[in-house]
Design a protein with these regions (language model features):
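A short N-terminal interaction module
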Residues: 1-106, 110, 114-117, 121, ...
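Short, well-ordered alpha-helical packing segments
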Residues: 128-132
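Class I S-adenosyl-L-methionine-dependent methyltransferase module
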Residues: 49, 53, 73-102, 118, ...
Length: 210
């Protein structure tokens, strides 16, 4: 059993990564959860008594996914203010969370049953760098087959423009340009031709479905 201290610590760890990724709203939210969580709700008790390894199990993401679902559904105005950054003081965030856990306990608890699927186009930058290395060694024509493609955003990689420290790859008129933080010399950009992209997932998501 992980123990309460370790389970709270998972939210501190998530807060650290949120700060590193310039996501201060989520960082404040995670810190408030870690500090203010109690057993006064079934959801709170389930998190504090989590029997698995909370970081590996993505416990913070499971709970925050549930909170975000409430915001998207328009179910709680104060929580929406936390997510938008209008409410940004730790004590105020803890107060909102305590009430939300009481008012929406039944809606939040099922979100702990499984980790959320996260879709972030920026992850395609690392994939493209790998594809460039393959193209340089084996030639430009590549096929992508992704296992666990979720909403399929990586499968749109041939439609994104990438800027790697000033070295560009992808359509110049692409509607999305991904510019990761780059240190050092820009990479070589060999010819690359992605001729097909395919993916599979046990629970595929439709990203156009709000």
């Amino acid at each position: 059993m992980a123990g309460e201290e370790n389970n709270r610590g998972a939210f501190h760890i998530q807060a650290f990564y949120c700060r590193e990724m310039d996501a201060p709203i989520y960082a404040r939210l995670c810190e408030a959860i870690a500090t203010g969580l109690t057993r006064s709700s079934r959801t709170g008790a389930a998190m504090l008594d989590w029997a698995g390894e909370p970081t590996r199990d993505a416990l913070p993401l499971r709970f925050i996914g549930g909170l975000h679902a409430l915001v998207l559904a328009g179910a709680d105005d104060d929580l929406a203010d936390v997510f938008s950054g209008v409410i940004d003081q730790p004590a105020a965030i803890e107060t909102v969370l305590a009430r939300v856990l009481t008012d929406h306990d039944d809606a939040l608890l099922p979100w702990l049953d499984g980790p959320p699927q996260t879709n972030e186009p920026g992850r395609s930058a690392a994939l493209m760098l790998g594809l460039l290395a393959v193209a340089e060694r084996l030639g430009p024509k590549l096929e992508i087959i992704e296992i666990g493609s979720s909403g399929g955003l990586n499968l749109l990689i041939d439609r994104y423009r990438f800027d790697f420290g000033g070295a560009g790859v992808g359509p110049k008129d692409a509607p999305v340009t991904i510019t990761p933080e780059w240190r050092g010399e820009p990479p070589a950009i060999p010819p690359i031709d992605i001729i097909s992209t395919r993916g599979c997932d046990v629970r595929p998501l439709t990203v156009t479905d709000p």
